[in-house]
Regions:
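Conserved catalytic core of the tyrosine transesterase superfamily
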Residues: 1-301
Length: 301
């Protein structure tokens, strides 16, 4: 069986609840498979049967040579281990999981940057997104779309995959229910800021659809009319922050962290914030928190 067949079946049964998780698990395992097949001269079927702990350790060394962070390498190990658990459970492989006794890399003492935006930075970011000379149709579309994305992520703390899965029809109501991490549902209210950004975006959303092209109904689409990917929005965020002279590595997740930080700084109870952003406990919310001592009253909650 070909690599893509194994990976597709794996994704179908193990990553069905999250498009982003599926993409990341597929990418990690595809990289490991291609590296190991090339190093060992194996076919895919041979790798399924023969891969062992030594192959995983060689791959870890390869990742380290690429300057991949310990946090990311540990994710790769986890993704590979999950793939081999699938192979064993579906009886493609009879031997043990090659990741079973692989020690995770030590991340103690390694500071992971927890970037977030101050209020003035968020306003500057939105201003850059909205303003540009010679506003062409393509820019009108991406600008309005990205303003809505930032507003949602910062106002209600959506995860990237939660925002990507939103459908246009859900905005017919003032309350939106989403399916989040672990398949758990939660709801949020559409604030005036969100409604205004959504209405502006809807004025231009359909301009990128080609005549006869099927509209899948996702709120966030690319310039080709297909469902947007996180990497595309994060790429845009990097450009926007650079133009706004914000010297931080801002991603969609950083906007979510900003949401948590600013609500807590504004005095919103941590239990309420945890429910809003879909955290399993307030201890998770606390890890997101970085006190700024400033208010963020313009969010409207």
């Amino acid at each position: 069986m070909e690599m893509n067949n194994y990976l597709s079946e794996f994704i179908m049964f193990y990553c069905q609840n999250s498009v982003e998780t599926a993409k990341n698990y597929r990418r990690a395992n595809k990289d490991f498979i291609e590296f190991t097949m090339n190093r060992q001269g194996w076919s895919m079927d041979e790798l399924v049967v023969k891969a062992n702990k030594r192959d995983v350790l060689y791959y870890i060394k390869e990742l380290e040579s690429r300057d991949i962070s310990p946090y990311s390498i540990n994710f790769y190990i986890s993704a590979i281990g999950t793939f081999f658990r699938f192979l064993i459970e579906f009886e493609y492989r009879s031997s043990s999981n090659p990741c079973e006794n692989v020690q995770r890399l030590d991340t103690d003492g390694i500071e992971q940057k927890q970037e977030y935006l101050e209020e003035y930075e968020y306003k500057a970011l939105l201003q850059v997104i909205k303003t540009r000379e010679g506003r062409q149709r393509k820019f009108e579309f991406t600008s309005s779309r990205d303003v809505l994305w930032c507003t949602l992520c910062l106002t209600v703390g959506l995860r990237a995959f939660e925002a990507l899965n939103l459908k246009v029809e859900q905005f017919n109501s003032d309350i939106i229910t989403i399916k989040g991490k672990g398949n758990k549902t939660r709801s949020f209210r559409i604030t005036d800021e969100i409604r205004e950004a959504f209405n502006e975006y809807m004025k231009v959303r359909n301009t990128v659809l080609i005549e006869g092209q099927e509209d899948e109904g996702f709120v966030f689409i690319s310039v080709t009319g297909k469902q947007l990917h996180t990497k595309d929005i994060n790429k845009n965020l990097k450009k926007y922050t650079s133009r706004a002279n914000i010297s931080k590595d801002i991603s969609s997740h950083a906007l979510r962290r900003s949401c948590v930080t600013h609500y807590l700084d504004s005095g919103v109870p941590i239990a309420k914030v945890a429910v809003l952003v879909g955290h399993s406990s307030t201890s998770v919310t606390q890890r997101y928190y970085k006190s700024t001592g400033e208010d963020f009253d313009f969010l409207g909650i």
